[in-house]
A protein has these predicted regions:
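A short, internal acetyl-CoA/4′-phosphopantetheine-binding micro-motif in the GNAT/acyltransferase core
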Residues: 90-97, 125-126
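Acetyl-CoA-dependent GNAT
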Residues: 21-89, 106, 112, 116, ...
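Conserved acetyl-CoA-binding loop-helix of GNAT-fold acetyltransferases
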Residues: 98-111, 138
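Conserved GNAT acetyl-CoA-binding A-motif
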Residues: 113-125
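Conserved N-terminal entry element of GNAT/NAT acetyltransferase domains
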Residues: 1-25, 156-164
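Conserved beta-strand-loop-alpha-helix junction that forms the acyl-donor binding cleft
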Residues: 123-132, 151
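Conserved acetyl-CoA-binding loop of GNAT-fold acetyltransferases
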Residues: 137-146
Length: 164
């Protein structure tokens, strides 16, 4: 599992940027990054330190960060249920976009999923996220017009706050 991420670290090291497995020690920097992304939705419980720690314990090798000079400049929460992978909160700091960092992080997360025997991965992007939607199509993801997405709130305290 970590072997494939080491390959990514070696590929990008010359650029002073590495992609590595996310740990709970990255939380403060990742939270700061999330809070700077316009249109981003942050949930009070799921995205709290405790919520992210629970997610990372369940999925210890599939979430990644891009780091340059000790600073987190990109992140993907990625996990699976044993059948399908899912990416959440894919983001790159605005001044680092359009350099392939998002694509490299997505590839690293997908390699980690493949190493765990996962054959398919999905993600949700807000319709208003034109930059993200364009990116996913550009890197070969399929937009599903044949599905409806439903969710049901089990805990009303898990409020989503949108960054404007």
């Amino acid at each position: 599992m970590q072997y494939s991420l080491r390959i990514w670290e070696e590929r990008v090291r010359e650029e002073r940027m590495i992609i590595r497995i996310m740990t709970i020690d990255d939380y403060d920097q990742v939270w700061h990054l999330w809070s700077e992304i316009k249109g981003f939705g942050i949930r009070t419980l799921d995205d709290s330190r405790e919520g992210v720690e629970k997610f990372l314990k369940r999925n210890p090798s599939t979430s990644v960060v891009a780091e340059e000079d000790g600073m987190v400049i990109g992140a993907i929460l990625c996990g699976h249920d044993g059948r399908r992978g899912c990416m959440y909160h894919v983001c790159v700091a605005e001044k680092y976009r359009k350099h392939g960092i998002g694509h490299q992080m997505a590839l690293a997360a997908m390699e980690a999923l493949k190493a765990e025997g996962i054959n398919k991965v999905s993600l949700i992007a807000f319709k208003s996220n034109t930059i993200g939607n364009k990116f996913w199509r550009k890197v070969g993801w399929t937009f599903r017009e044949d599905l409806n997405y439903f969710d049901f709130t089990l805990n009303e305290e898990n409020i989503t706050r949108f960054i404007e």
